[in-house]
Amino acid sequence: MEMAREDERKTALVTAIGSFSAREVIAGCRREGMRIIGCDIYPAEWVADSADVDVCYRAPYATDETAYCAFLAEVCEKEHVDFVLPLTDVEVDVLQKWRMESMDATKESEVTAEFAPLHAVLCMSGVETIRLCRDKEKMQNFLSERGLCRTIPGRELAEVVEAEAGSGYENLSYPLVIKPVDGRSSQGLARVK
C-alpha cells in the first residue's frame, strides 16, 4: 500500500551529489521549488552538497548494477520521486541498459516520459543520443561530417595493426595514445612508445 505524499512539491533524486556538477543541479532543482533527495557512494558527512538536499542516502556503486537499480527503485518508491537526475557516466550507462531491457525491442529509440520500473522520469538523453555520446569513434565521425568542430584524429587499433604491420610500425608517430572507444575520462588510457 502506497503511503500518501506529505509534501506536494515535485521530488527530484539527484545521484552522485559528490560530483562536480551536483551543486549546480541541486541549485537548479531548488530554483524550481523541488524537494531534493540526494545520494552518493560516500557517507553524507563526507559530501559537502549533502547539506543542500532535503534527504541524503548512501548509494551502492553503480557498477554493482543489481544493487544500484534495486536501491534506486527503493528510494523512488519511499520518497515519491518524480525525476531521477543521474550525474555520472557510469550511472547513465547502467540506467541506459536498464531502460533498454525494459523497452519493447521494436521501439528501441522511443523514450517514454516515465520510466516504469521507477515510476519517475529519467532526466537523461534518449537512447540514440547516449549511444552516440558514449562512443568516441561515432562522436568523432558525427562532428567531422557536420564540420562542427575539430577533433583529435583517431583510428581503431586493429586498423593500425593491419595497415602498419608490413612496415614494422616505423611510419607511426610515437608515442601513440590508446583509449577504449567507450572509456570515460582517462580510464583505460595507455601510451605506446
Question: Where in this protein do the model-derived segments appear?
Answer:
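Short intrinsically disordered, low-complexity coil segments enriched in acidic
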Residues: M1, G126-V127, K193
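ATP-binding N-terminal substructure of ATP-dependent carboxylate-amine bond-forming enzymes
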Residues: M1-C123
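Short histidine/acidic/glycine/proline-rich micro-motifs that form metal-
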Residues: F20, A62-T63, V127-L132, L157
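Histidine-centered beta-alpha loop that forms part of the nucleotide-sugar donor binding/catalytic region
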Residues: D89, V127, V181
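Active-site nucleotide/adenylate-binding loops and adjacent lid/helix of ATP-dependent enzymes
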Residues: M103, I130-K193
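General beta-strand structural signal in soluble alpha/beta enzymes
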Residues: C123-M124, I178
